[in-house]
Swiss-Prot record:
Membrane-related topology note: Multi-pass membrane protein
Protein name from the UniProt record: Palmitoyltransferase AKR1
Keywords: Acyltransferase, ANK repeat, Endosome, Golgi apparatus, Lipoprotein, Membrane, Palmitate, Repeat, Transferase, Transmembrane, Transmembrane helix
InterPro entries recorded: Ankyrin_rpt (IPR002110), Ankyrin_rpt-contain_sf (IPR036770), Palmitoyltrfase_DHHC (IPR001594)
Low complexity: compositionally biased ranges: 9-24, 47-78
Active site as annotated: C566 (s-palmitoyl cysteine intermediate)
Ranges where the record places region Disordered: 1-83
Enzyme's top EC category: transferase
Gene transcribed to yield this protein: AKR1
Primary localisation category: membrane
Residue spans, topological domain Cytoplasmic: 1-387, 434-452, 507-579, 664-813
Length: 813
């Protein structure tokens, strides 16, 4: 009997009727923090019971409408039985008298389907929607964005714009949460109250829009109504708190510029606490939202604010333990020793959350000394002096390694052991440099790649090559190879000048307004165009992004017509130094070829007869590969020969770089744009855009002017991939692939017999033909030879034969 009782109860639950109250969706808990008391997620769980009884309407993403069931009816289970069939059961003995339900035994012995049928016959009271179908129609039309019906109902006086059911949710609430901008405009124009509190959370329409990150709705409410961002809902959250909950960085930036500037009309205190004394920075740290954290810190958010659990934002950041988030908070001045109400500091919390290793890396990368109780490290060398030492160190390591290879003179052997020793000296010297010097002024991960060491390697190579040319080659070959030596001298002058010029010149920093009002005006322009997203606004530098620009982590600035970040010149390559960089690369490559040619001429002129019997161990095999001239240099001019071979190796990747850069220039592309071509064939990226579907841009404005993101792309590069990137081989391979596909692809589409060219199938708005692209790169202004030697003063350069300013280039038309 007990088993039967359980079965009957589980199979015939009481129907559950949805209420009419509704509110926006709560933010999701992002981390299980059961062992931490009074977490931010606990505030959301306080309303969990209320959420279960919400309206069947569900909030949707900006691309999906939100609808609600306005007519409630009893819900039946899948075992529902028509009441007419109650009199005709499988067996007449099974007929049920309703009076027998009073008996427990009768209930237990009754068939499940029969109990369901009896339950379904109960009459439910009419809902508010059923009692007032006109208002229900109005609410449903606001949800669906049916402006015609809403206008008809309001103009006819059948409903008032602020009419609600008992939940006090207005039509404006529904229009806001469903991103119906046209409807919001109409309702506000007809007197809708933007501060009406409704739903279980007693939230305003602005709250609903902020919770879902709807920038365009928030902007209209803020600028065209008296919507109050300081109003609090039942959970004590204001508009800024809810914007942070949405994790839409564009909305957070908008509210910071609109409400947290010194001269904001609708002022919001950036560290305004909620009911648990948690600020917006607490919530952003809990969510590990690095973009929001950086934005809040930029506007002066206090990292020392304490909530009711004595948690500072740093403590909440350990819930996920992202290194970038922890690092940003420590660099902003967070107290790593501050203790919460459980008497735990950041080290204890890191241990509890199993991220102690990450925490130690963060402290090291923020300049903390592990040998001194993590106190701030006191560098014994300044950053400027450290960079100079780093740059000059290869000037000593390279000749030392070359001399090791020359040990033994003309009787030398043991080629492989000497090569290993030379590489060990070079690698060991760089390792010590990294530990002793670079670590004193660069605390980030991958210190070597962020230091001027590679620029030093190149300049040291050029320095010793020039010395060899001056003291060995030039005196011997000056007469017989006069023109080659003159060309060599000219090329040395060109690549030396262009190298240092490309290193120290401003690559094209897009000016960043110092006045927040200017930035806000740029944001307003983007909103008007429907382009306020991460493709058109830089969330790192807070400036409107010109086309072809990108944020540089090296200089921490937005670079106009960004090409790439080059460790060999220790600078970014942009609109102002790209021509200089190409001049450097071309002249360097030609200089290497001329140096190799003159070296062979030198060996040929000074070589003497040598007896093969005097060859050292392994030299017979080496000479059989090198030939007479090279073998003479190998046996008699060891340092020169080693420099020759080192330059030959450098020539490989420099040639790759020349090929890739030339190809890209002829196609009207930068390195960054070329790398992004294959991504255009993939699905669209999320760029935090919340443009309403009914948004109407200004006259003549196109919404398709997009560009690759500024890079918040993330790669997990291994050491091999990093090496490929440094040498430019990855770009060469990509160029080779696309070139071969263009030449030999016979892909056919359907019944069309035309060949498919991957280079022409993608839309490249900067490609105006090979000749025009080449002229645009080298010439500024009119197509005259003298203009080839002009460098951009600001961001000017040619595009399709016309001068454009890449600092303010927002459209190709």
């Amino acid at each position: 009997m007990a088993k039967k009782k359980s079965k009957s109860k589980s199979s015939s639950p009481k129907p559950k009727v949805s209420s009419t109250a509704a509110k926006p969706v709560e933010i999701d808990n992002q981390q299980n923090i059961e062992n931490v008391q009074d977490s931010p997620s606990a505030l959301q769980q306080q309303s969990a019971t209320a959420e279960e009884s919400e309206n069947t309407a569900t909030t949707a993403t900006p691309s999906e409408g939100t609808t609600a069931t306005t007519e409630s009816s009893p819900v039946t289970t899948s075992n529902e039985t028509d009441p007419i069939e109650l009199s005709v059961l499988d067996n007449a003995d099974h007929a049920i008298d309703s009076n027998s339900i009073k008996s427990t035994e009768a209930v237990l012995e009754t068939l499940d389907s029969e109990l369901n049928t009896i339950a379904d016959t109960k009459t439910e009271p009419p809902t508010e929607q059923e009692l007032n179908p006109t208002l229900a129609k109005y609410m449903r039309s606001c949800q669906e964005g049916n402006l015609t019906i809403v206008k008809e109902l309001i103009s006819s006086g059948q409903v008032l714009v602020n009419d609600t059911f008992s939940d006090e949710i207005t039509g404006l609430h529904w229009a806001c949460i469903n991103n119906r901008l046209s409807l919001v405009k109409f309702l506000i124009a007809n007197g809708a109250n933007p501060n009406q509190l409704g739903g279980e959370l007693k939230a305003s329409p602005l709250h609903w829009a902020c919770r879902n990150g709807l920038v365009y709705i928030v902007d209209y409410l803020m600028r065209n109504s008296d919507a109050d961002p300081n109003l609090r809902d039942a959970q004590t959250y204001n508009a800024l708190h809810l914007a942070v909950h949405s994790s839409n960085i564009m909305l957070v930036i908008y509210l910071l510029l609109s409400c947290c500037s010194t001269d904001s009309v609708k002022k919001v205190y950036i560290d305004e606490p909620d009911g648990s004394n948690r600020t917006a920075l607490h919530w952003a740290s809990y969510q590990n939202d690095i973009f929001t954290i950086n934005a809040l810190l930029r506007f002066g958010a206090d990292v020392s604010k304490v909530d009711n659990s004595l948690f500072i934002p740093l403590h909440w950041a350990f819930m996920k333990g992202y290194k970038s988030v922890l690092k940003a908070l420590v660099e902003a001045g967070s107290d790593i020793y501050f203790k919460n109400d459980q008497n735990k500091n950041s080290f204890d919390i890191a241990k509890d959350m199993n991220c102690s290793n990450t925490w130690e890396k963060v402290l090291i990368e923020t300049g903390r000394d592990p040998k001194n109780n993590w106190a701030p490290l006191k560098p014994w060398v300044s950053a400027k002096l450290g960079k100079i030492i780093t740059f000059l160190t290869p000037y000593f390591l390279l000749p030392l390694s070359f001399n090791v290879l020359s040990m033994g003179g003309d009787q030398g052997g043991f080629i492989i052991p000497k090569l290993i020793l030379a590489i060990g000296i070079l690698g060991g010297g760089i390792y010590l440099l990294n530990k002793l010097i670079i670590s004193q002024y660069i605390f980030d991960d991958k210190k070597l790649a962020k230091s001027p060491i590679l620029a030093g390697v190149f300049s040291a190579t050029a320095f010793w090559s020039v010395l060899v040319w001056l003291y060995n080659i030039l005196p011997t070959t000056f007469i017989h190879n006069f023109f080659a030596n003159v060309i060599m001298a000219i090329l040395i002058a060109i690549f030396t000048w262009s190298f240092f010029k490309a290193m120290f010149i401003n690559p094209g920093f897009v000016p960043t307004p110092a006045d927040n009002n200017v930035i806000l005006s740029q944001v307003a322009q983007l909103i008007e165009l429907g382009k306020f997203d991460t493709d058109h606004f830089c969330v790192n530098s807070f400036v409107r992004k010109p086309l072809r620009s990108r944020y540089s982590k090296h200089n921490k600035r937005l670079i106009a017509r960004f090409d790439h970040s080059c460790p060999w010149v220790y600078n970014d390559i942009g609109v102002r130094n790209h021509k200089i960089f190409i001049t450097f690369v071309y002249s360097l490559n030609m200089a290497i070829f001329v140096f190799l040619y003159l070296s062979l001429q030198y060996f040929d002129k000074v070589k003497d007869q040598y007896d093969s019997d005097d060859e050292g161990e392994g030299e017979g095999f080496v000479c059989s590969i090198l030939g007479d001239d090279m073998c003479y240099g190998y046996k008699n001019h060891h340092f020169h020969f080693n420099v020759f071979m080192w330059d030959l190796f450098q020539c490989v990747w420099v040639s790759f770089l020349c090929i890739v850069q030339t190809f890209q220039i002829l196609k009207g592309l930068t390195t960054w744009e070329f790398s992004s071509l294959n991504k255009q064939l993939q699905t669209n990226r999320f760029n935090h855009s919340t443009v309403p579907r009914d948004f109407e841009a200004g006259e003549g404005i196109s919404l398709d002017q997009t560009q690759p993101s500024d890079g918040q792309h993330r790669h997990n590069h291994n050491e091999f991939q990093t090496c490929m990137n440094l040498l430019g081989i990855d770009q060469f391979i990509l160029t080779l692939k696309m070139s071969l596909k263009s030449l030999f692809s016979n892909t056919r589409h359907g019944n069309n017999n035309t060949n498919y060219d991957p280079l022409t199938s993608l839309h490249i708005p900067t490609d105006h033909g090979i000749k025009q692209n080449w002229l645009d790169f080298w010439i500024i202004g009119e197509e005259k030879w003298r203009n080839v030697f002009y460098l951009p003063i600001d961001g000017e350069n040619n595009l399709n034969g016309k001068v454009v300013d890449y600092y303010t280039l927002y459209s190709y038309h």
